[in-house]
C-alpha cells in the first residue's frame, strides 16, 4: 500500500512540474506588454507591446 501511495505521489509531482515548464515557456500574444522580441509569439516587440508589424514614427508612405 505504501508503494502505491508513493508512486501516485511521484506521478502527480511529475505532472505538476511539466505543467510549470509549459506555462513558463508560453509566448505573449499581440497587444500584450513585452520587453524583448523573443517574448512575443511572432517575435515582434514594438514600443513595449507585441505587434505583428512595427510602425516607425516619422516615416510617411509615398504614393506614386
Curated annotation (Swiss-Prot):
Residues that make up the propeptide removed upon maturation: 61-64
Signal peptide: 1-26
An MF annotation (GO) of this entry: toxin activity
InterPro entries in the record: Conotoxin-I_CS, Conotoxin_I2
Modified sites of kind Asparagine amide: 57
GO cellular component terms, A-Z: extracellular region
Tissue: Expressed by the venom duct.
Cellular localisation: Secreted
Keyword tRNA processing: no
Keywords: Amidation, Cleavage on pair of basic residues, Disulfide bond, Secreted, Signal, Toxin
Coiled-coil spans in chain: none
Cystine crosslinks: 27-41, 34-46, 40-50, 45-54
Assigned protein family: Belongs to the conotoxin I2 superfamily.
Record's comment describing the protein's domains: The cysteine framework is XI (C-C-CC-CC-C-C).
Protein name, as recorded: Conotoxin Im11.1
Source organism per UniProt: Conus imperialis (Imperial cone)
